[in-house]
Design a protein with these regions (language model features):
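Extreme N-terminal starter segment of soluble prokaryotic enzymes
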Residues: 1-4
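N-terminal strand-loop element at the rim of the active site
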Residues: 7-11, 23-68
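Conserved alpha-helical elements of sugar-nucleotide-dependent glycosyltransferases
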Residues: 13-24, 133
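Alpha-helix capping/helix-boundary segments
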Residues: 40, 95-96, 154-156
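An amphipathic, basic-hydrophobic alpha-helix
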Residues: 62-87, 97-98, 102, 132-136, ...
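Nucleotide-sugar donor phosphate/pyrophosphate-binding loop at the beta->alpha transition
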Residues: 107-117, 123-144, 149
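Helix-loop-beta element that forms the nucleotide-linked donor phosphate-binding surface
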Residues: 156-165
């Protein structure tokens, strides 16, 4: 299976969990493609089953803030199309799950239905979920994911609200 994993490349828990999961999946014979703005710090690329795709984050004079989520969405579309990925596993509701959902809609115009697994790591709900400006995006990203996991528990596909997750 060809699996895309989207995570933060930093020392935090979500990046560690995503990287270790990807390494284990590669050791089990899967082809794993990490997609992030930097190589995850625990990722060893000396495996013929592990690939890294960097999300280019360019500064544009028009934007006060770099639109990382849009760059990530475009990169996800590109990697799924060119690497023929079977599934996307994203860690964190925003910007990763929301970018994956947008990519899924774009890929549908190419006749591709890519399943999305979203793993929540707590702070994306407890911290970001408290900010009402993020709530509709978080709920949408979670609800549009095919599978939602949280601390190694799989949640059935149903409508989630930030308060219930």
């Amino acid at each position: 299976m060809k699996i895309g994993i989207v995570c933060y490349p930093t020392y935090g828990g979500s990046g560690v969990v995503a990287t270790e999961l990807g390494i284990a999946l590669a050791e089990a014979g899967n082809e794993v493609h990490f997609i992030s703005y930097d190589q995850p710090f625990r990722l060893d690329l000396f495996s013929e089953k592990i690939y890294y795709h960097e999300v280019a984050v360019a500064d544009y004079p028009l934007f006060e803030f770099t639109p990382y989520e849009l760059n990530l969405t475009s990169k996800l579309v590109d990697v799924v199309l060119h690497e023929k990925l079977n599934i996307l596993h994203v860690h964190y509701a925003i910007p990763h799950a929301s970018a994956a959902v947008n990519a899924k809609h774009i890929l549908a115009t190419h006749g591709i239905n890519i399943p999305i697994i979203t793993t929540l790591h707590g702070t994306d709900i407890t911290l970001l979920g408290k900010d009402k400006s993020f709530k509709p995006v978080i709920e949408y990203a979670i609800n549009m994911s095919d599978i939602v996991t949280d601390n190694d528990k799989v949640k059935p596909k149903k409508t989630h609200t930030v308060e219930r997750v």
